[in-house]
């Protein structure tokens, strides 16, 4: 069994390309946060404040578009512990599980954005605001665009752009558990020069505020 780091804001999962309108915005310059977008960002940070930890079942369907062109399904558990510990443990052999470590980029919690990124706004459309996050530390990621629902302050989509020309994008939908908004499904696409895949993830059986040993989050 292999621990695979990912951000559930994510899971983390599962990836689908943003709408053409969102891509058009992504080509423009990001504007600084104003009073309205700052208020939305604060709501996003405060979302699910009562949740200290959770565990959930996850089912992952992958369709590789590059060699070896397989379409495996994996099951496992996703774990979260405040403030920013997240991981997925797949119920499969380490060799197979390790192949999907690259599927999920790390997603930092919104409360960490201002420390890690230069945060701006690309625009608002169809009831959603797109934030652009540019890493302050030099690395593989050029920027990350995050689409936030203005009514619920939930993240509807992520889109990473990498310096090597690769992209990772996914849309996600939510379910309500104990008054909290938690990811129920993610659908998306991974596109790197040497690795391409369509990914769908489904989450269920959330258990909130349970005890989780920190060893679960250690790389193995």
Model-derived regions, located:
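Bacterial N-terminal signal peptides
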Residues: 9-18
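Edge/loop elements at the starts and ends of beta-strands within beta-rich repeat scaffolds
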Residues: 46-54, 69, 82-83, 151, ...
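Amphipathic hydrophobic-ligand
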Residues: 38, 68-77, 163-169, 197
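Gly/Pro-enriched, hydrophobic low-complexity segments
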Residues: 126-219
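An acidic-aromatic
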Residues: 63-124
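Positively charged n-region of N-terminal signal peptides that target proteins for export
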Residues: 1-6
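N-terminal leader/targeting segments and the immediate start of mature chains
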Residues: 22-63, 83
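Extended lipid/amphipathic-ligand handling interfaces
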Residues: 43, 75-81, 170-177
């Amino acid at each position: 069994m292999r621990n695979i780091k990912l951000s559930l804001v994510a899971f983390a999962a599962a990836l689908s390309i943003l709408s053409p309108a969102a891509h058009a915005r992504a080509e423009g310059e990001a504007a600084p946060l104003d009073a309205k977008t700052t208020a939305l960002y604060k709501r996003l940070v405060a979302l699910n404040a009562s949740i200290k930890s959770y565990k959930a079942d996850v089912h992952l369907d992958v369709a590789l578009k590059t060699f070896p062109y397989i379409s495996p399904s994996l099951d496992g558990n996703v774990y979260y512990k405040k403030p920013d510990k997240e991981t997925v443990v797949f119920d499969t052999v380490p060799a197979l599980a390790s192949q999907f470590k690259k599927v999920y980029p790390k997603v930092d919690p919104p409360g960490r954005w201002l420390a890690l990124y230069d945060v701006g706004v690309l625009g608002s459309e169809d009831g959603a605001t797109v934030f652009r996050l540019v890493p302050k530390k030099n690395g593989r990621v050029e920027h990350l665009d995050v689409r936030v629902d203005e009514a619920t302050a939930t993240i509807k989509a992520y889109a990473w752009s990498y310096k090597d020309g690769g992209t990772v994008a996914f849309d996600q939908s939510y379910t309500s558990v104990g008054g909290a908004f938690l990811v129920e499904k993610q659908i998306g696409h991974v596109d790197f020069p040497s690795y391409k895949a369509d990914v769908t993830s489904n989450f269920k059986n959330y258990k909130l505020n349970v005890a989780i040993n920190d060893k679960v989050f250690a790389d193995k």
